[in-house]
């Protein structure tokens, strides 16, 4: 009976084993349920993160559509960022000068006048004159506006070059008083800023009025612009110019062309006259032909158009590439990866607009190759580019071939014949011979477009073409993309459907700009995630230490992170997506992106460090700290004050705060020095050992000698 109660009988043992098994099953079930709950929570968190990223993407898209080049990751705490106060801490000019380029029958293009006077070197002056005129023979009359980049002959220390941006109003009309029978003259605005939308609108106003009022008009216009508010990044301004007000938002970043048009209003002065505009035969060349001057006031059609100018009305992607809508994704890749592109067009406006539209395709990324919206055979860099074309070879395949190729065929995507990343816009067919074996050539624009009409022309060319056939092809105004590049990404069917269903070109342009902006942002998501792992934590910022450094960006590690995730960012085929990222990490656009991200992160860390100093309770932080710590801190705060006084336009209030901190630290150091001195004296006076040795040291040497002698004598 006792053994039964004690549970040692076989039945009890079996019962215990069953109980143990039941408990194990329950524990396993609980553990499984716990894991399932954790997985659900993890999935929920991931979905939430994706939704948050989607919201951020949607928000930044809306912001960027209104203002391309706006920093979608910038810190909003501009009060703490001294670099937001001005450009490089000093007042920046909106423009450099106005120039007049005339055609002289004996010497050709010549710089007639400039205000303020420019001091160009001979090469720069030559480039300016040729860039300010169409590089092709044409007897068409009218006005055109386009833009170019003017290279300065002196290079920077880092191997890069300075550029000015030129905005041209060119007029050609019959004039019997001129021996050639035609007036050919250009008004040019030169600026360090690539505000294409703004300055093309300025030239629409200034150009026609110049031909009525002469050089004095340019001086007045220049003074108007010099009276504009100080140029600061990220600000919105109302800018008066010759009776009009241009509402313009300055982008948050510099370097990439800012192609958004400003909103235009007219002053209500003297019955509304102030240099009115009237319409002339328009061209579809991206705003090529423009209104001409008229003293009778503003034509109702033009005025209504001007009032309707919105921030969405920019360089027209659809207008430039209407014949290549299915190839826009391939063009996006070519620009993204920095492949060289030659754009051939019949006129400078379409040429320059097409190049700028290509560069803007990868926004908000900065295109870091050498892009020239308009390039001529007389440019001093012409021989540099022809030197890259000495290699012989067959023409690229027709890009209309089937792109569903095996992955092994993508190894030819980097075959650029040693040509650096560049996009050249040209109008002279001679470039087809000079740069005949550039790997990617885009011929755009037809005679119908040049005359105002637009007709889509399809061509059936052989896959491999000779240079002569290619030249005839361009001279016949056939539009084509000639490239052997095999794209990774396929056209978006939903976007193509919207294009076919819409009859409004402005809506189509907005759809395309939004799509490619989001495409670039989605492409950057894994790179942004990896870069965030390189950043130090904000809690590591301490006023007693310099801001922490960033970890190095390791390409292989980044690619492994992308491989490990199951997400597809822009391509369904994972191997193709990895290959696209691999090629991007080796191109110049990535290098600039990484440099910009590092600079932005370091800047942010410095802002946090600056904020930590400003917000610090120095009395509390120094309590109990050794004098060496106070000395180091004093040096750091003094260095920061030097930066505030010399590089930044810091307010007096903030500078006084730094000075107050410096005074507190100095007082603390003085107190430490005094305390140490007092402590040393107290130690010397109170310690018996030290007192004895002190008294022994104080005794005269003779007294010691005498005592010794006396002792000896006594003995």
Swiss-Prot record:
Q: Give GO MF terms, alphabetically.
A: guanyl-nucleotide exchange factor activity
- Pfam families reported in the protein's UniProt record: Avl9
Compositional bias (Low complexity) at which positions? 399-416
Query: According to the UniProt record, where is the region Disordered?
Result: 269-296, 392-416
Does the keyword Coiled coil feature in the UniProt annotation? yes
Top-level taxon in the UniProt lineage? Eukaryota
Q: Which ranges of the sequence are coiled-coil? A: 13-58
Q: What is this protein called?
A: Protein DENND6 homolog
The record lists the organism as Dictyostelium discoideum
Q: Which residues form the cDENN domain?
A: 299-476
The dDENN domain is annotated at 478-600
Domain uDENN intervals: 96-273
GO terms for CC?
recycling endosome
Q: Give the family this protein belongs to, as stated in its UniProt record.
A: Belongs to the DENND6 family.
What effect does gene inactivation have here?
A: No visible phenotype.
Say yes or no: keyword Nucleotide-binding present. no
> Mind listing the UniProt keywords for this protein, alphabetically?
Coiled coil
């Amino acid at each position: 009976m006792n053994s039964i109660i004690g549970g040692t009988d076989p039945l009890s043992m079996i019962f215990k084993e069953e109980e143990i098994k039941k408990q194990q099953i329950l524990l396993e079930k609980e553990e499984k349920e716990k894991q399932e709950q954790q997985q659900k929570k993890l999935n929920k968190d991931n979905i939430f993160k994706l939704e948050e990223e989607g919201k951020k993407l949607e928000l930044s898209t809306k912001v960027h559509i209104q203002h391309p080049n706006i920093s979608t990751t910038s810190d909003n705490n501009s009060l703490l960022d001294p670099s937001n106060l001005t450009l490089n801490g000093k007042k920046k000019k909106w423009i450099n000068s106005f120039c007049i380029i005339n055609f002289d029958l004996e010497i050709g293009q010549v710089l007639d006048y400039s205000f303020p006077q420019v001091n160009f070197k001979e090469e720069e002056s030559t480039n300016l004159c040729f860039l300010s005129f169409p590089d092709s023979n044409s007897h068409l009359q009218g006005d055109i506006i386009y833009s170019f980049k003017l290279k300065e002959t002196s290079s920077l220390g880092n191997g890069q070059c300075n550029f000015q941006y030129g905005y041209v109003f060119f007029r050609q009309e019959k004039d019997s008083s001129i021996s050639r029978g035609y007036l050919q003259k250009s008004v040019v605005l030169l600026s360090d800023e690539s505000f294409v939308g703004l300055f093309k609108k300025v030239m629409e106003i200034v150009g026609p009025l110049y031909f009525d009022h002469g050089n004095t008009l340019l001086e007045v216009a220049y003074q108007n612009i010099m009276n504009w508010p100080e140029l600061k990044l990220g600000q919105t301004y109302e800018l008066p110019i010759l009776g009009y007000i241009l509402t313009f938002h300055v982008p948050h970043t510099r370097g990439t062309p800012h192609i958004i048009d400003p909103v235009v209003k007219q002053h209500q002065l003297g019955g509304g006259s102030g240099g009115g505009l009237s319409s002339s035969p328009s061209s579809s060349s991206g705003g090529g032909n423009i209104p001409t001057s008229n003293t009778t006031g503003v034509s109702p059609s033009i005025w209504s158009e001007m009032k309707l100018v919105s921030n969405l009305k920019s360089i027209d992607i659809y207008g430039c590439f209407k014949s290549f809508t299915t190839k826009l994704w391939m063009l996006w890749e070519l620009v993204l990866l920095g492949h060289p592109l030659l754009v051939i067009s019949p006129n400078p406006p379409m040429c320059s607009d097409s190049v700028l539209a290509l560069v803007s395709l990868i926004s908000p990324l900065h295109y870091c190759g050498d892009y020239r919206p308009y390039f001529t055979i007389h440019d001093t860099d012409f021989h540099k580019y022809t030197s890259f074309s000495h290699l012989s070879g067959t023409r690229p395949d027709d890009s209309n071939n089937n792109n569903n190729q095996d992955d092994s065929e993508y190894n030819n995507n980097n075959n650029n014949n040693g040509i650096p990343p560049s996009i050249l816009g040209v109008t002279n067919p001679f470039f087809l011979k000079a740069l005949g074996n550039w790997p990617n050539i885009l011929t755009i624009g037809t005679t119908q477009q040049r005359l105002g009409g637009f007709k889509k022309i399809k061509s059936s060319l052989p896959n491999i073409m000779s240079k002569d056939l290619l030249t005839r092809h361009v001279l016949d105004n056939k539009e084509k993309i000639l490239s052997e590049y095999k794209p990774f990404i396929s056209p978006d069917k939903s976007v193509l459907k919207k294009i076919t269903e819409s009859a409004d070109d402005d809506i189509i342009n907005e759809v395309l700009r939004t799509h490619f902006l989001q495409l670039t942002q989605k492409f950057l998501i894994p790179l942004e995630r990896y870069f965030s792992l390189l950043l130090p934590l904000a809690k590591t910022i301490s006023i007693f230490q310099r801001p922490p450094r960033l970890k190095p960006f390791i390409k292989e590690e980044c690619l492994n992170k992308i491989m490990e995730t199951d997400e597809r960012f822009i391509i369904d085929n994972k191997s193709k997506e990895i290959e696209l990222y691999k090629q991007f990490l080796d191109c110049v656009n990535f290098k600039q992106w990484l440099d910009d991200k590092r600079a932005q992160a370091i800047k942010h860390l410095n802002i946090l460090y600056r904020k930590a100093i400003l917000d610090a309770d120095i009395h509390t932080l120094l309590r109990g700290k050794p004098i060496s710590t106070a000395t180091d801190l004093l040096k750091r705060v003094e260095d920061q004050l030097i930066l505030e006084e010399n590089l930044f336009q810091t307010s007096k209030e903030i500078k006084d705060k730094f000075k107050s901190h410096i005074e507190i630290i100095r007082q603390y150091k003085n107190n430490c020095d005094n305390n140490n001195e007092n402590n040393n004296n107290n130690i010397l006076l109170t310690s018996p050992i030290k007192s004895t040795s002190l008294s022994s040291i104080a005794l005269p040497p003779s007294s010691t000698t005498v005592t010794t002698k006396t002792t000896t004598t006594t003995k």
